Amino acid sequence: MSQGEIVQVIGLVVDVKFSIGKDLPDINNALKVIKSDDDSIILEVILEQGDGVLRCIAMESTDGLRRGMKVEDTGSSISVPVGPDTLGRVFNVLGQPIDGGPEFPADHPRSGIHKEAPKYDELTTSREILETGIKVIDLLEPYLRGGKVGLFGGAGVGKTTIIQELIHNIAQEHNGISVFTGVGERTREGNDLYFEMKASGVLDKTAMVFGQMNEPPGARMRVALTGLTIAEYFRDVEGQDVLLFIDNIFRFTQAGSEVSALLGRIPSAVGYQPTLATEMGQLQERITSTKKGSITSIQAVYVPADDYTDPAPATTFAYLDATTNLERSLVEQGIYPAVDPLESTSSALDPEIVGQEHYDVATRVQHILQRYRELQNIISVLGMDELSDEEKLIVARARRIQFFLSQNFFVAEVFTSVPGSYVPIKETIKGFKMILDGHLDDLPEDAFRGVGPIEDVLKKALKMGVTPSDPEAKALLEK
């Protein structure tokens, strides 16, 4: 392997000079700086400066680096452990365990984090729904198996909570493998997630990779690729259907922006890196389904200042099959998950994919909620008394639908002391159809809040002293 030496250190940017005439390390190669016998730092080659000088980004703190230190070319990009042994473990960007468990032996299978996306003839085009057990998602923005989903929302509206619930439901109900990638988020959240998953018994079905907000931008920029590489092994070698969670894809863009500034590139719109679309494409094009297996990706997207036209979320939109938009006004009303049923979308909400009944119920729900939103302006100015009887009925049913879209989560049990619920798609459709058809008009609104299937509404109403008068509702209660 060729050797060079450090000629300049500017924060996290390190310039390394190699002898002219010898083979220079390739772009994206990992270089190793040996600080002492038991301490080294990994750099990644970003660009060539000329005269044998390569500009690199450090994956760790550059404390202690100085000019003249020897640097070795590893001959490949950053390589991380792959395979079934990664399940139940926690890694950093370099694939090193950070959970206090045993190190992986030198001969353990590894894979480089930089790869080409699958070729067109390797891709599959089947369109199948992935049941999540979350009513608002399954009804109005169903997720495709092997698709890409964006969870959009500002700070503190529940993106990470939905991701945790999805991991729980997929592991418990589908026995599926998940890879969780924490990109630039709070270390506390990662710590909580690890222990919650351990307690709920789903950790042994999950590999976790973290590059948190206290780490250098180089690590935060590459950690998503580390998680993706682990997921690709399960798809390509073991032929599995994998869920890849990225929390948060905005921090991936943000880290790229920091690296771009450190490299001295001229910024683009709103101060983002000029290579924003390219970097996003290199990541997203690898997240796909092949004839061997699938990767279903669920990505939390922080929206700066709730501005959806910001280049970071706007660039992400282009790659998504479904969007789940979280709305702060619903949080203020105490409706969880705070998913906006009218702004959230899915390309899978098509009668040929979900079936005619599902499609009809979903569009009727959207129509009645849209009409309610229009009537709210009249109500806020003139009050309910100015509405016609038909409009009052629309408002009453819309409010019941809005509350019935809320649901208790398994992962929130420790905070709420209320058991979570998993609702199959068939039960979800049945419940909303009964509300739309007027079978539950005589039940109080509060009975619909924070429940699972429609049977829970009837039981809750009974506890409140209200017995349904509708024959269909009575028959369901007797069952």
UniProtKB/Swiss-Prot annotation:
Listed EC numbers: 7.1.2.2
PROSITE patterns, sorted: ATPASE_ALPHA_BETA
The reaction(s) this protein catalyses: ATP + H2O + 4 H(+)(in) = ADP + phosphate + 5 H(+)(out)
UniProt KW Metal-binding keyword: no
Database matches in Gene3D superfamilies: 2.40.10.170, Bovine Mitochondrial F1-atpase, Atp Synthase Beta Chain, Chain D, domain 3, P-loop containing nucleotide triphosphate hydrolases
Binding of ATP, residues: 153-160
Cross-referenced Pfam families: ATP-synt_ab, ATP-synt_ab_N, ATP-synt_VA_C
Enzyme class: translocase
Coiled coil: none
Alphabetical list of InterPro entries matching this protein: AAA+_ATPase (IPR003593), ATP-synt_VA_C (IPR055190), ATP_synth_F1_bsu (IPR005722), ATPase_a/bsu_AS (IPR020003), ATPase_alpha/beta_chains (IPR050053), ATPase_F1/V1/A1_a/bsu_N (IPR004100), ATPase_F1/V1/A1_a/bsu_N_sf (IPR036121), ATPase_F1/V1/A1_a/bsu_nucl-bd (IPR000194)
Domain of life: Bacteria
Quaternary data: F-type ATPases have 2 components, CF(1) - the catalytic core - and CF(0) - the membrane proton channel. CF(1) has five subunits: alpha(3), beta(3), gamma(1), delta(1), epsilon(1). CF(0) has three main subunits: a(1), b(2) and c(9-12). The alpha and beta chains form an alternating ring which encloses part of the gamma chain. CF(1) is attached to CF(0) by a central stalk formed by the gamma and epsilon chains, while a peripheral stalk is formed by the delta and b chains.
Job of this protein: Produces ATP from ADP in the presence of a proton gradient across the membrane. The catalytic sites are hosted primarily by the beta subunits.
Name listed for the protein in its UniProt record: ATP synthase subunit beta
Gene: atpD
